[in-house]
């Protein structure tokens, strides 16, 4: 009996020790403009981190930057407080990651949407143009006016990459289609300006577009309001946004930031972290389009079938999607 009790105590202590070790793994998440409630890019990152907290037992703290000057001090604060992994969400954090990672070489860092070459930094990159191509094809197959729209957030190469892929996919289906494109601004505020998103979308709808794809962070929510007013279709981005305006969000271009964030946390915690670039595309479902109970009645089966055929052709290399980064 005593031997059994000693064994039970040993197992219990071992369990507590293991739980403590896991709980001691600390992750600091620095979100971009718009914050975790943007229902898009940041929301996806936050979802991946909270899933890691739930499943892996990590300690998680997130902060929302109010302007670009805040990124570096926020990251440095995490590093100084002995966080094991610090994740920056968005290309605007590239310079901050470069500086802080160099100052704390024993810490692990990750960044979404920017390439930082350092042994302790993982760059999480996505083939947005591939996903946008499929979305463009879906928009063109659904349009009855021969005009579709694109509302981008900040006018930067990343969003131009979305736009280029979107237009190429639309023209694959209808070479004569007109693609209207506008951007919400040239500063970080462009990601969190729903009134501007709505203004641009209304103008595009009133110019004849009947489907609009948004790649604008929280500003895209304004475009969804415009879709509701005009009773036209909009397309979401990054997270599955079909639920936000049921019957009006035709689909969403999924960019699995949540998956990338979860994976890098898991690898860092388990001692398998390596620096370098990890890319996510159609082949590994890093980008895709959404189908669920909110859009299955408006996203026609014939459209889905053709979209899936195009996905297969891209993965097989039969279609090479134009890439703004390589133009």
Where are these regions (language model features)?
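A residue-level marker of the well-folded mature domains of exported/periplasmic proteins
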Residues: 23-327
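Bacterial N-terminal signal peptides
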Residues: 8-19
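Positively charged n-region of N-terminal signal peptides that target proteins for export
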Residues: 1-6
């Amino acid at each position: 009996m005593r031997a059994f009790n000693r064994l039970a105590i040993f197992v219990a202590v071992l369990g507590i020790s293991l739980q403590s070790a896991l709980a001691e793994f600390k992750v600091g998440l620095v979100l971009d403009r718009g914050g975790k409630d943007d229902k898009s890019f940041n929301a996806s990152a936050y979802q991946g981190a909270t899933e890691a907290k739930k499943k892996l037992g990590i300690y998680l703290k997130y902060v929302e930057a109010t302007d670009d000057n805040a990124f570096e001090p926020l990251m440095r604060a995490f590093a100084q407080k002995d966080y094991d992994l610090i994740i920056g969400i968005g290309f605007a954090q590239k310079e901050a990651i470069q500086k802080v990672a160099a100052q704390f070489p024993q810490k692990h860092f990750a960044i979404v949407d920017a390439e930082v070459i350092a042994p302790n930094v993982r760059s999480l990159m996505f083939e947005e143009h591939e996903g946008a191509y499929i979305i463009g094809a879906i928009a063109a197959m659904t349009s009855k006016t021969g005009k579709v729209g694109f509302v981008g957030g900040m006018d930067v190469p990343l969003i131009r990459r979305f736009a280029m892929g979107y237009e190429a996919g639309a023209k694959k289906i209808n070479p004569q289609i007109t693609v209207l494109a506008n951007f919400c601004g040239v500063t970080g505020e462009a990601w969190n300006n729903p009134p501007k998103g709505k203004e641009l979308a209304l103008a595009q709808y009133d110019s004849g577009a009947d489907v609009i794809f948004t790649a604008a962070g929280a500003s895209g929510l304004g475009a969804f309001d415009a879709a509701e007013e005009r009773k036209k279709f909009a397309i979401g981005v990054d997270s599955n946004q079909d639920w936000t305006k049921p019957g009006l969000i035709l689909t969403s271009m999924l960019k699995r930031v949540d998956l990338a964030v979860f994976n890098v946390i898991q690898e860092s915690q388990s001692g398998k972290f390596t620096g370098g670039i990890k890319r996510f595309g159609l082949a590994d479902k890093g980008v895709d389009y959404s189908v669920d109970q909110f859009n299955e009645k408006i996203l026609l089966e014939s459209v889905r079938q053709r979209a899936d055929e195009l996905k297969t052709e891209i993965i097989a290399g039969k279609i090479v999607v134009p890439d703004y980064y390589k133009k």
